[in-house]
Amino acid sequence: MALCGGGLWFITALFFFVEVHAQPVLEVRQTIRELGISIGTFPTGTLNAITDVPGVRVGHTTLRKGHGALVPGQGPVRTGVTVVIPRDDVWNHKVPAGSFVLNGTGEMTGLAWIEEAGFLEYPIALTNTLNAPLVGNGVISWMLKQYPAIGITDDTLTPVVAECDDSYLNDSQGRHVTEQDVVHALESASSGTIAQGSVGAGTGMRSYGFKGGIGTSSRVLPEADGGHVIGVLVNANHGRREQLTILGHPMAPHFSKVQAPLQTTEGSI
């Protein structure tokens, strides 16, 4: 998904996580830019995140519980939900929107209305595949609290929920993400620095045979091209080890001595 500021517009791209609300303690790792590798040609925004676009807020609820062998319906739990709020009062100040599907193995509810109407009027949520309906309920509950006239004297809504399969690391049958988890992510959504990696919807994801998860970036266009800020947020859960490249260079040969990749399907992003 991408957001652009300076005349706000919205694009959703499908190339195609006891209740725990505390943020996990994660190892701080260097970003690829901190390692001296620069991706792309345009400069990044201040945060190099989707929240460089004015008004955009992101929130996570991360669920980690249990260890050991899978017990369907119980755990271990490695999942969560991530939400993107395009702007304040988006119901009354809608943003132009569109979609593009590259990999049809991912699903996203609410796209039919976006394609028909050409705008977005509520937050986007990301989560695991089997939790998508419950997460949609959470978005609806939050929206009804914010806008009590929905479905009575105002229009109704179809929540936008994108899913990825985290069943390799998570007890997906347990559908552990609750409506309260979704509301927590929405209520705690903020601008500024975004937690990345194994957080929110990315908690149980894997990519290119390694641990995947949430990533974000931004670019600032030249003034001659409008000076817009373009922000992107992804939930990476795709790719085989041999497909991983950085700046066009295959990475698989450099990982021949590490753990063999455990990838069963193409996945989605």
Regions found by a protein language model. Give the residues of each.
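N-terminal secretory signal peptides that target proteins for export/translocation
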Residues: 1-4
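Alpha/propeptide regions of enzymes that mature by internal proteolysis
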Residues: 23-269
